[in-house]
């Protein structure tokens, strides 16, 4: 769903995805829930806005929920950036302030690791823990 805007135009995918979600009824979601989904996917490619920029549309609690969901989505998208499903299994461990995500793969994950590092600071800001991506080579 977060990449649905790419079917309209490869420029500004997040904004196009936002427009598709806001203009489409999604069975089982209220209008406000649909707006939350739209804002989560809107900022997967750009900078996440400050609360003051969208405070007329969401409460502070909703803003925090959107920010956290966006941070999770951005890391998940980074781990499959090439859209080749290079990882087969994941383990997640939290030690201190680190959240270590270890994925099993034999493939080169240079692209995924680089994007993961770019997206990590926002996740750390949203959750207060530092995400770390590790590769476990397996046969």
Predicted regions and their residues:
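C-terminal accessory subdomains of helicases
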Residues: 89, 105-108, 119, 135
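Generic beta-strand/beta-sheet core signal
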Residues: 34, 44, 102-104, 134-136
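A short interface-forming secondary-structure element
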Residues: 100-114
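A short amphipathic beta-strand at an alpha->beta junction
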Residues: 127-139
């Amino acid at each position: 769903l977060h990449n649905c805007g790419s079917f309209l135009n490869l420029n500004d995918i997040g904004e196009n995805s936002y427009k598709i979600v806001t203009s489409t009824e999604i069975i089982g979601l209220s209008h406000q829930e649909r707006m939350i989904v739209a804002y989560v996917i809107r900022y997967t490619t750009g900078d996440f806005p400050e609360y003051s920029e969208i405070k007329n549309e969401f409460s502070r609690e909703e803003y925090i929920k959107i920010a956290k969901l966006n941070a999770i989505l951005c890391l998940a998208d980074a781990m499959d950036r090439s859209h080749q499903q290079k990882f087969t299994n994941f383990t997640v461990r939290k030690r201190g302030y680190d959240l270590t995500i270890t994925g099993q793969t034999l493939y080169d994950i240079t692209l995924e690791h680089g994007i993961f590092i770019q997206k990590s600071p926002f996740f750390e800001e949203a959750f207060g823990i530092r995400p770390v991506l590790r590769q476990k080579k397996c046969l």
